[in-house]
Amino acid sequence: MAEAFGVAGNVIGIVSLGIQITQGLLKYYESWKDQDNDISNMCASLDSLSETLKILSKTIHPPARFDDTTKDSVEKNVNRTDGAVGKLKGELGKIQDTEPIQSGVRSTMRRHVRRALYPFIEETLSKIKRFVSEARQNLDFALQVLQVFASQRFASTGTQGLG
């Protein structure tokens, strides 16, 4: 069985970007966690997605080696996740200061009001939940592929040792 040298660099980049984005969203929304059960659940989902991305990052980071089929499947699923990560990045951009900081009480108040009201828009919470769910489904499949690969490798190594 031919072995590939891990997964493509763009896959590692997608995973790293996903970690940064989920951590940014999580940091912002955790401050609102006690305000509403929906936000608390969303924080738990973001945290879970972030942890899944971290585990995947450790698993696929070089010098990890996989056969071509495993490598292709993992790359395909992580690339599908890129769309959801991009959408989450858009949501993160909405809560970060997007306009140049201007001096003055009025500008400061407008920025604070915008940031304070944003998490409570129900549609926004639903969108983020959908994006997180989409990303988790693809990542879960990628992790399952890696688990099957590891199990097969362990089984073949164990069988060779018995003979």
Predicted segments — roles?
Residues 78, 122, 132-133:
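Amphipathic alpha-helical bundle/coiled-coil segments
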Residues 1-73, 88-95, 106, 113, ...:
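N-terminal amphipathic alpha-helical segments
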Residues 126-144:
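A hydrophobic membrane-anchoring alpha-helix module
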Residues 99-108:
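Short, well-ordered alpha-helical segments
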